[in-house]
């Protein structure tokens, strides 16, 4: 995917390039409404296109949430999955300041969902896990040092 969109920063220009890059590995086939027999089956040589294409839009958009989502939305095929993954990844990389405020406000109001607190909770859990891992590692290092 990286090579397919190297130097491309326009999501519209990236759409045919990403489609061409994933096509040899795609289980669905060229006609999304008339899927091939192997569609969506686990394979060592094929891939479900959504995640690779979403990552492609994150690259093309340079991590910009709005551009990543617009690219994914306009890609077609499983656009809702591609756009939501691209937006989630770009948003996670950039943090709250990278998410368009107007989008966040509209989505929070329409879904009646607090979009900020779950992120704070997940960040807190990640910090707790990191601290516990660091403590376990320090215990391991001390035990190894005691052997030498």
Where are these regions (language model features)?
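Accessory "access/gating" subregions that flank catalytic or transport cores
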Residues: 1-76
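Catalytic phosphate/nucleotide-handling subdomain of diverse soluble enzymes
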Residues: 49, 53-133
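A glycine-rich phosphate-binding loop feature that marks nucleotide/adenosyl-phosphate handling sites
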Residues: 3-4, 89, 140-144
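Generic structural signal for short, solvent-exposed loop/turn connectors between secondary structure elements
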Residues: 1-2, 113, 148
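Bulky hydrophobic segments
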Residues: 130-148
């Amino acid at each position: 995917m990286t090579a397919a969109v190297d130097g491309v920063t326009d999501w519209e220009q990236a759409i045919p390039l990403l489609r061409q890059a994933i096509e040899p590995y795609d289980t669905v086939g060229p006609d999304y409404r008339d899927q091939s027999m192997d569609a969506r089956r686990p394979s060592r040589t094929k891939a479900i296109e959504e995640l690779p294409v979403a990552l492609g839009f994150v690259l093309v958009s340079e991590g910009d949430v709005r551009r990543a989502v617009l690219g994914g939305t306009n890609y077609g095929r499983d656009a809702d999955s591609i756009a939501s993954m691209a937006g989630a990844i770009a948003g996670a990389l950039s943090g709250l300041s990278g998410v368009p405020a107007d989008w966040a406000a509209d989505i929070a109001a329409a879904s009646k969902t607090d979009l900020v607190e779950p992120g704070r909770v997940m960040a807190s859990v990640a910090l707790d896990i990191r601290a516990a891992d660091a403590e376990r590692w320090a215990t391991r290092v001390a035990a190894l040092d005691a052997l030498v």
